[in-house]
Amino acid sequence: MAEKFTQHTGLVVPLDAANVDTDAIIPKQFLQKVTRTGFGAHLFNDWRFLDEKGQQPNPEFVLNFPEYKGASILLARENFGCGSSREHAPWALTDYGFKVVIAPSFADIFYGNSFNNQLLPVKLSDEEVDELFALVKANPGIKFEVDLEAQVVKAGDKTYSFKIDDFRRHCMLNGLDSIGLTLQHESAIAAYEEKQPSFMR
């Protein structure tokens, strides 16, 4: 079972860039591992650090600004997560501590992979995202509340509605990954298997 996602309130960091691809999110040299942990250290590695080893932080990159330390909501521009289909991209984001990414649009494969890894991708209109960038710029350190049950983002004195399809919403609200979803039907699967001839078991 994965962690349930119902509602999250967190610090917002504004990444004011469109077409952020998966190679920028987690560069290919860090993909050797097959477990989901440890990738956060290399998130946006080529942007966060001035050296290849990731030991010299880039003071001009927004994730390194002290006011955004501990951010758990990433605000981005259109076509976030484009490029190759590596599942390591949402792994890196969640391992770093992000729970939500808000953007006008996402690459399709990244969008699906995010739900599989309990990272909530929230689509809002370009105009709404513009408003949120302006709000964060004027109020560094602001927190947003993201409510998956009500499908709204509360930011400042405004509320923004978003839509997640019923199946994905059900899975996230109940902490169901593909294994957990299968286990929901364990008794039905067992009953089906019992009906099969012995040579097919």
Curated annotation (Swiss-Prot):
EC primary class: lyase
Alphabetical GO biological process terms: L-leucine biosynthetic process
One Gene Ontology cellular component annotation held by this UniProt entry: 3-isopropylmalate dehydratase complex
Pathway in which this enzyme or protein is active: Amino-acid biosynthesis; L-leucine biosynthesis; L-leucine from 3-methyl-2-oxobutanoate: step 2/4
Subunit note: Heterodimer of LeuC and LeuD.
EC numbers, comma separated: 4.2.1.33
Protein name: 3-isopropylmalate dehydratase small subunit
Keyword terms of this UniProt record: Amino-acid biosynthesis, Branched-chain amino acid biosynthesis, Leucine biosynthesis, Lyase
Native species: Citrobacter koseri (strain ATCC BAA-895 / CDC 4225-83 / SGSC4696)
Entries under Gene3D superfamilies matching the protein: Aconitase, domain 4
InterPro entries: 3-IsopropMal_deHydase_ssu, Aconitase/3IPM_dehydase_swvl, AconitaseA/IPMdHydase_ssu_swvl, IPMI_Swivel, LeuD
Lineage, highest ranks first: Bacteria, Pseudomonadati, Pseudomonadota, Gammaproteobacteria, Enterobacterales
GO molecular function list: 3-isopropylmalate dehydratase activity
Superkingdom of the organism of origin: Bacteria
Reactions listed under catalytic activity: (2R,3S)-3-isopropylmalate = (2S)-2-isopropylmalate
Purpose: Catalyzes the isomerization between 2-isopropylmalate and 3-isopropylmalate, via the formation of 2-isopropylmaleate.
Family named by the database record: Belongs to the LeuD family. LeuD type 1 subfamily.
Amino-acid biosynthesis recorded as keyword: yes
Keyword Amino-acid biosynthesis: yes
